[in-house]
Amino acid sequence: MDRSLWAVMGGTFTLRFSTGLTGAMLAVYLAKLPEHGGPVVAATTLALLHATFYLSELVLSPVFGVLSDRLGHHRVMLFGPVFGAVAVILTGLTTNLTILGGTRLLEGASTAASVPSILGYIALATATSEVLRGKAAARFEGATLAGFGVGFAAAPLLFAAFGPVAFYLNAVVYGVSFLIYRFGVEDHDREERAVAATARASRMDLSRYGALLRTSHVWLLAPTWIAVNASIGLWFSQSIFQFSQANPNFPDQVLHRGFSAVEISLTAVVVGILFGIGLLYWGNRFKNLRRTTIILYGIIGGGILVAGGVAINHGAGLPFAVPVGGVLAAAFGLFVLAGATPAALGLLADISERFPTDRGAIMGLYSVFLAVGQIVGSLIGGFAAEWRGIDGLLLATFALLLVALVPLAQLRRQEHYVGGPSQAASLGDVETAP
């Protein structure tokens, strides 16, 4: 990867760090809001504020995707850090819940502006190389995961040390992201932007999304990716809450005995490392494996993960080999599941090759699918956990993975029609790869 792509990855890490840091610190801030002169915050209010972020990302990603095609991916990716910095400064200044809701909308706008433009830039920069596209997709997902993880881990310590002032420090990190994008990333899309300008009317035409969404490949990819995101998202929303306290309603489930914060944190670190290794491994297999093959492997890996989780959750009283085997199966399944995310991202980038003047609009669908998946996963996870606890989450995960399989066969049959890197030369390779 060249210097600009590495800078994009570095900026993605710092930007996602700031996003994760804000979200986690806000949860602590709201819990202690009366100490800072604000009202007592109910759990439902916290949930509403959490959903507001994803709603903003869902609605605004198409807007900024189209805008990045008109103004340039490099220019629009600069908007995100600015929105984020304003949002965190306002967050530290107020205890008013309405204003805090507005800051979550602004924070969602930050992500909505950044992600489609970043991914549009990556799609353009990797248009000539299967290997480079695989590496870039995996590293983008890795930078996203690492940024979120470090932000979540640092949030309690920073807020304990600085209080609401920590939000202002986060604005500095947003400033670092802006500087990385401004001076570290070269504007590669001047020529493509000029073509786009002559191809469209002078106004920003969101009706372009209608034509793009009529592409069958998008509709085949959408349910698969949304379902995979939902299967992962339900654990993001429920796992810490479920693991952190004993639940007498499910005495037969080992994972409901209640775990300490240290145990949960160490497990999260191990999960993050395994997922990150999986991202790098499968991201380097784009040249030899079809995108849909890697997605299929990922879904199968998710099924193995579920089976391992069941063995762990019901391993009490059974031979020691059963829970140990469950741990190994879950670890292997997670490693394989990780490949589905860069493969789906790479496939979306391939689809963008058919619409070279609409890369930002196409890649904006990444945020749309992610937001829908997170919202759906959160809702399903809540009902599943109430119904059967960890077993309910495992069953919901398995069901969502089955949903992801349904359109995959048809998508696989049409995959060779999707333009990818070195399109004319490589379509045959794509068809014949395993």
Predicted stretch roles:
Residues 1-2, 187-222, 426-434:
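Juxtamembrane intracellular "pre-TM" segments in multi-pass secondary transporters
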Residues 59-72, 277-291, 385:
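Helix-to-loop junctions at the C-terminal end of transmembrane segments
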Residues 75-90, 293-309:
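Structural signature of the two symmetry-related core transmembrane helices
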Residues 50-62, 148-149, 272-280, 374-375:
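Residue-level signature of mid-helix packing/kink "hotspots" within the transmembrane helices
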Residues 58-95:
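Conserved MFS/SLC helix-loop-helix module at the cytosolic interface between two early adjacent transmembrane helices
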